[in-house]
Amino acid sequence: MSLKEWTIMIYMAGDNNLAVDMAYALEQIKGVAEVGAESPNLFVYYDGNSPSIPTLYCDFSEPGKAIYVRSYKVPDKLYPVSNAKENENAADLRSIVNFVDWCVNRVQVEHKGEISYGRRAEKYALIFSGHSLGFQDIGLFKDETSGKSMTMKDIYAVLERLTMCREELDKKADDNKWEGDLRELSTKLLLGQPLDILGFDSCVMGMLEVGYQFSNMTKTMIASEGSVPSAGWTYAKLLGCLAREQNRNLDTPSVAELFVKQFIRTQDAYTVGGVSVDMAAWDLCNFEYLAGAFDELAEVLIKCFKDPASRIYRQMERVILHVHWKCQTYMYDQNVDLGDFCELLDRECGSIAEEIGGNDVKILQEIQQACRQVGEELRRSVILSGFSGGSYQYSNGVSVFFPWSREGYEVSRKNYKSLWFSKLATKKRLSWTAFLEKYLYEVSVRRLELPDEDVPVGSRYRYYSGVKFHEDLDSIMSGNGNSATKIAGQEGSKIAGQEGSKIAGQEGSKIAGQEGSKIAGQEGSKIAGQEGSKIAGQEGSKIAGQEGSKIAGQE
């Protein structure tokens, strides 16, 4: 039996309010197999939130022969899941590894009377469907039955294990370097090669930081900078394209491009309901260069803020604020589109250079050159990006973390600083982290004025109440004073992103003002498919006055 070109595995972490939508998607995927014998190998892991429905392994690879297997009945799993029940914990990284092992090594295949095991292929795609919030670990592929969520480190460990070749497995087993729950010295080959496509049918994963994290383990990544509707990807359209005769010999970038086009076109029909989406396909082989160019930009920006008394310091303080305000944003305005940010920054620096002249022009020109270099690398990295609706119309395919305040940074700092797990990144942390800390903790914060005992009539009387220690005063004078305040990330604070908080004034909302998106799952949302529900729309919203969608990318 000859290898098919593609084995596509879809991991549906639906033990939450996405269960019904994922059940519909499951039927869409099953329908793709009816196209014909040339359809790809199709597998789905489905974990719903009904206690009466067990977690399922589904094989839709052959027309008319859909196979459903209860996960808990699969014997001798590679990595047994602790306290395994009928409803499996989809947020356990071992569940992912076991599912992929079943797809490529264990599923029974009958062909012309002969029995074999596993459906291998020339190319592999792994698509995660569920809740996410970018690099944050808040609600990542949340499993409500177990009360657990995944972490970015979990996903990294999973992809590393899946893609290891025989030599790497043998060496790692000999050196006993397994980490976390994958410490068992298993040398069983899974994919044995980098993923051809890594997809995230979930919110806010289209970040430079996320893509760079996985750039050594996958060739192409498909993700969205903003929110994804609860209904998720239109799998019937996306996967059905692969089964068409004219598309069977497409290379991987062309397949990824096809996914983006089909998703944007199908979602365009829902703009009348206020639905806005974006999606991009990336060539991760170029992400090292994109990250390097972005690193150079961050270093130049840091140079601008060495002397608070300098003219360039004051000018760039205003420029950054202005550009940040106008830029395309995502994730409660905590992320900015990288292309839009650099384009606006380039333009503003050019305007200022014409006005101020002098020695400051040189550093402004350095910023402009760095912005243009980021733009060039971005165009090389983004195979195709697209949007539909008005909310994401300035998207260019890749976003970066840029919160508005030190409080917003503090709530995410631990996760953000732990992102760089790959060998290349641990040698040199990107300077953007240093810029964020410089800008948010010093540049954008007003310094406290010292109290004055001699207060003239009509002025403000400043007085320190209570006892102040020297270290508190030093912190306050440097603009970092957080004493006796409720700072994001501290226990008891009410900052968006903490469990149980009220985000954007809407209790139980998924994302500010949008119902039904796949933002790090919170209870209380309205699920598509239920009577009277609203599917991923904004009631009464106005759509940027544009007909149709705009596909932005490379031919």
Which residue stretches match the model-derived regions?
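Terminal, contiguous helix-loop blocks that mediate binding/assembly
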Residues: M1, K112, G118, G134, ...
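N-terminal extension/subdomain marker
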Residues: M1-E122
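Structural recognition of the beta-strand scaffold that forms the well-ordered cores
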Residues: T7-Y11, N41-Y46, Y124-F128, D196-F200, ...
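Short beta-alpha junction loops
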Residues: D15, Y46-P51, H131-S132, S202-V204, ...
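Active-site groove signature of glycoside hydrolases
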Residues: R119-F135
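Long, intrinsically disordered low-complexity tandem-repeat segments
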Residues: T485-Q554
